[in-house]
Amino acid sequence: MSGLTAKTDSTPVKVHLKTKITIGEESDSFELVSFGRYYEKGDAVFLKYDEVQEEGTTHTIVKVTDSQALILRSGAIKMRMAFNESEEQNGSYESQLGTLLLTTKTKQLSHTQDESKLEGDFNLSYELKMQDSPVGDYVMSIHYKEEA
């Protein structure tokens, strides 16, 4: 996964998130730049960062292994989404109406990291359903780089 020695202490990173959502013929793109923490545990890489929006702050944790990913969000938005290229995964979204079932069908999942420095990319493409109804196609990329 990386040439870095496994460490449980975290490193400050700058996170650049890009998301493109396609629903039918319509597409929307969003970008976020945030500062967060990077750490490794076992065979997984973790990114922790906050998203500040009108609704409030959402704390996000992204966990990536060679073949799977998990995105956990808490705070203003509470969501759990799992990704695996070999099978659909169930997750959840908590709303005022209760907890809704999310299903992801991963089309592409990759993680690359420059072994000489703490800088990398996580790319994810997936179809999202909520309560078994299609929501849209998502393409997400996260670039992270150690803060000097």
How would you name each of these model-derived features?
Residues S2-A82, S86-N123, E127, S133-V135, ...:
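N-terminal intrinsically disordered, cationic/polar leader segments
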